[in-house]
UniProtKB/Swiss-Prot annotation:
This is Hemoglobin subunit beta-2. It comes from Gobionotothen gibberifrons (Humped rockcod). This fish has two hemoglobins: Hb1 (major) and Hb2 (about 15-20% of the total). They display the Root effect and the alkaline Bohr effect, which is enhanced by organophosphate and to a lesser extent by chloride. Belongs to the globin family. The keyword Signal does not apply. One of its GO terms (cellular component) is hemoglobin complex. The keyword Repressor does not apply. InterPro entries: Globin, Globin-like_sf, Globin/Proto, Hemoglobin_b, Hemoglobin_oxygen_transport. GO terms for biological process: hydrogen peroxide catabolic process.
């Protein structure tokens, strides 16, 4: 993947401003509410009965933060995201048996949460860079499935 200077700067800027303790939990909670079938991967998380329970669930919050910190690895290795996520792809494919389509659903939820947090500064150009980055991450996480 070729990255422009603008794309690199944009991705670094977004992640430097993210409030991980807010955005991570909000992203995973949104995914679990909007796409309830994704809840099957989190059976050990306890009460996921409704949107309020999901939003207040400490395990959802913790894992949402973990996911964002996982994206830090891609930010730091933008020129080699596929290899950066090779082990994580194997884990999600062979041990956790996660449907790879769910990575895109989570990426879409992250885009919505980030757009809401950034407001007018999340322009079309910024969104294009962010979604390009997330599409490379999603592809890398799904690599083991191919």
């Amino acid at each position: 993947v070729e990255w422009t200077d603008f794309e690199r700067a944009t991705i670094n800027d977004i992640f430097s401003k993210l409030e991980y303790e807010v955005v991570g939990p909000a992203t995973l909670a949104r995914c679990l509410v909007v796409y309830p079938w994704t809840q099957r991967y989190f059976g050990n998380f306890g009460n996921l009965y409704n949107a309020a329970a999901i939003a207040e669930n400490p395990m959802v919050s913790k894992h949402g933060i973990t996911i964002l910190h996982g994206l830090d690895r891609a930010v730091k290795n933008m020129d080699d995201i596929k290899n950066t996520y090779a082990e994580l792809s194997v884990l999600h494919s062979e041990k956790l048996h996660v449907d790879p389509d769910n990575f895109q659903l989570l990426a879409d939820c992250l885009t919505i949460v980030v757009a809401a947090r950034f407001g007018n500064t999340f322009t079309g150009e910024v969104q294009a860079a962010f979604q390009k980055f997330l599409s490379v991450v999603v592809s890398s996480l799904g690599r083991q499935y191919h």
